[in-house]
Amino acid sequence: MKVNPSVKKICDKCKVIRRNGRVMVICENPRHKQRQG
């Protein structure tokens, strides 16, 4: 899980979602997991 001020899709499988008011990226590749904060 990377915590970045700006989250971007890294590959085609990445999805940007909102969870509990936080913007997150979920992906098949666990290295691509990101959270804004």
Curated annotation (Swiss-Prot):
Keywords: Ribonucleoprotein, Ribosomal protein. It comes from the Bacteria. GO terms for cellular component: cytoplasm; ribonucleoprotein complex; ribosome. The keyword Ribosomal protein applies. Belongs to the bacterial ribosomal protein bL36 family. This is Large ribosomal subunit protein bL36A. It comes from Leifsonia xyli subsp. xyli (strain CTCB07). One of its GO terms (biological process) is translation. The keyword Manganese does not apply. GO terms for molecular function: structural constituent of ribosome.
